[in-house]
């Protein structure tokens, strides 16, 4: 018999209990009863083994053992969450029937939304959602989804490049912000030029002398929104627009002349930086903005009307330019990079000592960003790659509408003591108090227009008045009592009107028509329909946005039309033929706009606001045409109809076009609808110029094709900023960029709203929808400011509060004052 112990089955009782490795989700482990955090460095030797000398040391504080997080559902814009938000299951089952393999979206671990942050969440959600929608298309869903998926990954690669540059390259994040700011300053939000011709002002695209910034022998640097018209001999011709701010004689940049100026610019900036007097040089440079650098070389006129009638542009051409916009831009960048070796040889051969000294100094101090900027600046002056591009407008047009003439009442004009009014016996003032569309005024056949020619005999055209000039003031009095039917008769100031003396409703114009109710003199509403002696209409108010309306119109109990309104504008001039303007009098004074001078329903001398009782108050406007109008007054949107006096065959030259302050509606992808024989101040998106239709008088183009429009613009503000940055003028650079931000505030408004929408979207769909609804109805800084304050984005809130209300033009006096302040401060220190 063996003396060895009998083998036993291993159980929990007889098994040697040795410490087992316990794995936690975070990667840590327990050693000696202490939870140790996971090591981030290289794992060498025996892990978590205490030395003999350390065993006598007191143990550290025990770390709590982490618990595995419970899996949560994916939210909107997160990887793995199907898009769109609604109808995904229905689209999936419907798409599975004709295309079973390409219906369900499946991204896997390569979902671009996994690396998204900030604005990238919005971009990747849109691109990936577009990919998912492509998969729902029957039969061809799979190949289309594959192509769209490749495009989404390409967009993600570009975003990764931007993220790497902003997070790793020193100073690149600020440079991207600077480029975004300069892109906002390229084409202004509203730019148009005015020419004075034979006593009338009219719109043009020709640059005035005040828009010319710098002149070379074969090139002109000018402000955006115009094209130079140069007189050579006995004829004037338009120069070729290379960029929105540079025009040349023959479409080629004169490299020799520009390189001389770049040589001087870089050399002086390098000297200031090397001597550590950058702010001193920058302040002197800013003060020098008050003086002219070079004499005039060319005779610029305004007799060409460059690109005012570009011809018909289809939506296909616009879409083609948009698709082709990236390829020439890439070619332009690559061409400039490949041109650097030749540029270095040209520097040495051409003895450009300023550029060479700048490159040498910036290389020695290790400022490679400035070296690259100087190289690209010198190599880019002979680039001949041009880009034609555009952007689509985001607007909608509602073509359906009902003209509502109202109920039938026989109306006839009567002349009493030289004043025309409606026959009192034909009207029923009690029935007319119903202001709905069912009980309006009368049908066309119920009006006898035999007296209209005599009634309108006292009305005059805008061309019959003298031209105004100088600053605009306001008149104190008003026009006659019984002749408000002509556009040029200024109304009296509004006050309190007894309700018993009014027949029908009282309409006031904001410019949208609104009906004013009866109240007592203290403002408390009454409901006796004006039967009491104490019922009145309180109409005294001021012009929007400070007040409620521009003016009011009603009919008194004897059939006469009465009006009141804000004080009209006095546009200047001498003699007895001057005009007190109650509407937009652009052709007599460019500063007389409707928002500044409007005193009633007249939007222009041809058009007035259409409302249900228009044919009662203005019966001779029965043949006016109706146009859809959208306006913004004080940041508030107004959608209304305008009745315009326009007949086919009338002359509509540039001298005959009025100005209309509209945010026009779209007729097509490339056309806006404006009032007949007028123009709106919004320039075309691609060129920054005014483009009108030559044959159709109520069409203006939102997209235009210039001679050769480059995507990169050169402005004098950029030249000043480049000099200040190269010269290390830190204080002057900050002041100059503050001026640029204030100048670009109008273009930054939409950018601020987009940024606030992105911030709200990162906190969920509900917050995004709430922000969208408020931003749709409330314009201004309140909604983005509330979002920034709610989510704690205090730097953006401070930036938003620092922006001015309106974008003011950057003039030389402001720049010189900033430079003078810095110069005095340096001398005092």
From Swiss-Prot:
Residues covered by region (Important for endoplasmic reticulum and mitochondrial localization): 112-152
The organism's place on the tree of life at top rank: Viruses
UniProt-annotated stretches for the region Important for fusion: 265-296
Start and end residues of each stretch annotated as Disordered: 2-75
Organism: Hepatitis C virus (isolate Glasgow) (HCV)
Name listed for the protein in its UniProt record: Genome polyprotein
Region (Interaction with DDX3X): 2-59
Region feature (CD81-binding 2): 544-551
Family of this protein: Belongs to the hepacivirus polyprotein family.
Positions of modified residues (N-acetylserine): 2
Region (Important for lipid droplets localization): 164-167
Residues of this chain annotated as glycosylated in UniProt: 196, 209, 234, 305, 417, 423, 430, 448, 540, 556, 576, 623, 645
Region (HVR1): 385-411
A cellular component term, taken from the record's GO annotations: virion membrane
Membrane spanning stretches: 169-189, 359-379, 726-746, 758-778, 782-803, 814-829
Stretches the record annotates as Interaction with EIF2AK2/PKR: 2-58
Leading EC class: hydrolase
Region entry CD81-binding 1, spans: 480-493
